């Protein structure tokens, strides 16, 4: 806990900048607090996973039969507008791997986000999106990562997450990036890519890591912080 406190405090309070954050996962609704807190701190916010579909739909894209929270489109637009007003960059997918059902080794194809079919399901980010994310990370000094880019537990829709994870590990080992990741799905994805040990720090605190990123004070962390005061 002591090590986690020190790492997270440095990353969120006094990071080397530019500071980038990757936020993925299924739903915007579960990470509203996280998105809003990070927008106040980061230089670049990279949005992936199912939650990116809600942002794409909010910006006028058809997302077919993809997971999408249509009741949160106005909220997504507000977040984008807030980011623009604060001079924060939001990075969304520019292409996607789609299929007509979620199944292992189902026939899939890569399409631009403005060409999603009515029966398509977005299941991963495409190669152009992967390269765009990697180019953003190459310019960053610090990264906080919570949530995968695609349906990583079903192959081949883990590839976007794996490629970004490997690039992050390489930047970290080259001394160009401080990389901190956490959350159950994130840790599982990094372990699947066999890169977790190559990140600067991987939190195993699960939900507590998410609450920290949301800006919530955690009792254990508050106690440690108090003990550190002279």
Residue ranges, per PLM feature:
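Active-site loop-to-helix "anion-binding N-cap" substructures in soluble metabolic enzymes
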Residues: 1-230
């Amino acid at each position: 806990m002591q090590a986690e406190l020190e790492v997270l405090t440095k990353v969120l309070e006094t990071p080397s900048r530019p500071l980038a954050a990757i936020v993925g996962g299924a739903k915007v609704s579960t990470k509203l607090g996280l998105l809003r807190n990070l927008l106040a701190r980061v230089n670049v916010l990279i949005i992936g996973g199912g939650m990116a579909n809600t942002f794409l739909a909010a910006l006028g894209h058809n997302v077919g039969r993809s997971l999408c929270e249509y009741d949160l489109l106005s909220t997504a637009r507000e977040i984008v507008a807030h980011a623009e007003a604060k001079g924060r960059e939001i990075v969304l997918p520019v292409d996607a791997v789609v299929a007509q059902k979620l199944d292992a080794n189902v026939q899939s194809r890569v399409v631009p986000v403005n060409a999603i079919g009515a029966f398509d399901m977005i299941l991963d980010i495409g190669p152009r999106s992967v390269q765009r994310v990697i180019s953003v990370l190459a310019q960053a000094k610090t990264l906080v990562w919570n949530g995968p880019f695609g349906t990583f537990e079903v192959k081949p829709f883990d590839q976007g997450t794996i490629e970004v994870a490997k690039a992050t590990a390489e930047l970290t080992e080259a001394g160009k990036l401080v990389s901190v990741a956490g959350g159950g799905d994130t840790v599982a994805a990094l372990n699947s890519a066999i890169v977790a040990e190559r990140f600067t720090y991987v939190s195993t605190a699960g939900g507590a890591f998410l609450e920290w990123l949301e800006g919530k004070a955690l009792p254990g962390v508050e106690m440690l912080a108090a003990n550190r005061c002279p």
